[in-house]
Amino acid sequence: MERNVVIRLENVTKSFDDQVVLKNLTLDVRKNEFLTLLGPSGCGKTTTLRLIGGFEKPDEGIILHHGNDISNLPPYKRNVNTVFQKYALFPHLNVYENIAFGLKIKKMNKSLIKEKVEKALRQVNLVGYENRRIDQLSGGQQQRVAIARAIVNEPEILLLDEPLGALDLKLRQEMQYELKTLQKELGITFVYVTHDQEEALTMSDTVVVMNNGVIQQKGTPEDIYNEPVNAFVADFIGESNIVEGIMRQDGVVEIFGRVYECVDKGFAVNEKVDVVIRPEDIKLLEPSENKINGQVTSCIFKGVHYETCVMTDGFEWVIHNTKSFTPGENVSINVDPFDIHIMKKMEKEAGT
């Protein structure tokens, strides 16, 4: 096992009531990494988190911590802390007492507890809130208390199960940057669970996209967004136009009877493929006999861009651009070669 791998799930399978939720999953989590488990409800991401935390045991496979098998080790014996969506703060205790609770259970002396709590308060920007009651705090402040209570124990790994889910959009976006900054300052490993693609792309060093208990793709946010390995990932990570194409040769794909240059190679001649094109990568120009032509069906202003829908041969394209178009207007679909992503048809089946 690599020296910088702190946790490895190796060939892990987990079922509940005869329903398999994780299927022979293998995953490495590295030191000081911000790793996000991303996927729809029921994909197995929270179960994976609970296995790392010791709240569940694998039916098959093992969980290793620095090479040591911890599959049956209870949570309190793991150097791991968890922050849940429901923060589970003690309403009868103030901020200081909530953060200090775990340290008191360990019977640390008061001066050391005070030192550690004050450090945690500084790290989450809550200095001056020590004596506040929990019901006097905003949602964002309560979340900071929950994080402080977790990091005050100085865990090697912090698990976060959709901790921003209860916050409003603006506060959620602010907390994304705060969490990423905090992780870098602490120098510890974060394993974060979310179904929110923006959260995953904004904060993570590594994103693990899951579906039906299987890892679909693991990579940097840029890799996941720009080079999805199958149609599920392409569709789940932001909007995508996914159409059927035919590879005529390396670097040439036919879409709706029109030929486009692309950069993908290694496909058989005349092989049917899935073609993925992001809405922001499409340019709408005057109709052309060499391009796919269609008619604008709608154009909606979204603030930073217009969302334009164009119908061509029974398929409705979604395009994001800065120009307004009129419904009924005739246009052509134009895409640069490096913005056309080709995937094997069989890879779409893996994500369904």
UniProtKB/Swiss-Prot annotation:
Major place of residence: membrane
Alphabetical list of InterPro entries matching this protein: AAA+_ATPase, ABC_SmlMolc_Importer, ABC_transporter-like_ATP-bd, ABC_transporter-like_CS, Mo/tungstate-bd_C_term_dom, P-loop_NTPase, PotA-like, PotA_ATP-bd
SMART domains, A to Z: AAA
Keyword match NADP: no
The enzyme's E.C. designation: 7.6.2.11
Pfam families hit by this protein: ABC_tran, TOBE_2
Membrane topology term: Peripheral membrane protein
All copies of domain ABC transporter, residue ranges: 7-237
Keywords: ATP-binding, Cell membrane, Membrane, Nucleotide-binding, Translocase, Transport
GO cellular component, one term: ATP-binding cassette (ABC) transporter complex
Subcellular location, record wording: Cell membrane
GO molecular function: ABC-type putrescine transporter activity; ATP binding; ATP hydrolysis activity
CDD domains linked to this entry: ABC_PotA_N (cd03300)
Catalytic activity of the protein: ATP + H2O + polyamine-[polyamine-binding protein]Side 1 = ADP + phosphate + polyamineSide 2 + [polyamine-binding protein]Side 1
Its job: Part of the ABC transporter complex PotABCD involved in spermidine/putrescine import. Responsible for energy coupling to the transport system.
Similarity comment: Belongs to the ABC transporter superfamily. Spermidine/putrescine importer (TC 3.A.1.11.1) family.
Summary of subunit composition and partner proteins: The complex is composed of two ATP-binding proteins (PotA), two transmembrane proteins (PotB and PotC) and a solute-binding protein (PotD).
NCBIfam families: MMSYN1_0197, potA
Annotated protein name in UniProt: Spermidine/putrescine import ATP-binding protein PotA
Organism name: Acetivibrio thermocellus (strain ATCC 27405 / DSM 1237 / JCM 9322 / NBRC 103400 / NCIMB 10682 / NRRL B-4536 / VPI 7372) (Clostridium thermocellum)
